[in-house]
Amino acid sequence: MKKIGRGIGLSFYGTGYGNGFPDVSKARVRLLEGGKVGIYVGGTEVGQGAKTVLTQIGAETLKMPVEDIVFVHEDTVHMPDAGTAAASRQTYNTGNAIRVACENFRNKLKELAREHLALNSIYGLKVENGKIYLDFFPQKSLSFEELFEKSSKGDIEAEGEFVAQTVMMEEETGQGAPYWPYTFNACGVELEVDTLTGLVEIRKAVFAQDVGRAINPHLVEGQMDGGFAMALGYVLFEDLNLKEGKINNNKFSKYLIPTAMDTLEIEKIIVEDPESTAPYGAKGIGEPTMIPVGPAILNAIYDAIGVRITELPVTPERLVKAIQEHEKEKGEVK
């Protein structure tokens, strides 16, 4: 018999390392030949889209096209440490460090332009589209390329640092802010349970994710799709068989992960509520997108068959066994 169930899962997630561990990101910005700008951070791009979003943050702060930004990362010798690509912290922490570095860089450009343009001060100077100009007299201007040629090449740079703010928990009240910021989400699924075979099929899913501000909506949707697929594997497929510290099912023929046939097109709702301390309001959503999916699936299974599953993954064998035990208990009660 096939039964339909619906379930909802909710979560909130504190980004960053949290209390008790220094959470620091640093960035360097440098003027390059041809008027391009290099952004240097020791943060890792693992496919989550950090390189794209961090480039966009730099381009927005410098008011220049993203095509003119050269993003350099993952070189621990020549660039400042931006911390790990973990705890959903790169967009918020390193994004803030880049914003600060770009603001310092803008001020440095204004000072240099003031000297070359023989101006009294930097007041009225604007930095946009690869040039520095006087707002009320635009003829007084200097392009990034011209400034690079006029200066000692390679020495026009600035750095920025961001340290995440947290509040230690009060011992008596338990109140505090061990992480900041927090992100929130919700997931709802409709699924079908085959009570004979134990197979579970997700029929429909809706996912709502708070992102602060979606700097790159396509990447946000990609994170939501990826988090859902990863959680699907965690809940229904990936059964790690360990014995004496050794993985027994170390082949994909034995350790199953979701394929394109197992996933589905989910309805994605991006919730924007800009975070005041974040770079242009954006928050990280790496890990959070996975968290509510499991509870939603487990609640939907319970809704379908009336059995609470407390062991993951919910393999067909475990599900059939749980159903049989539940039926046996009902029979004994009668």
Where in this protein do the model-derived segments appear?
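Cofactor-binding beta-sheet edge motifs in enzyme active sites
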Residues: 1-334
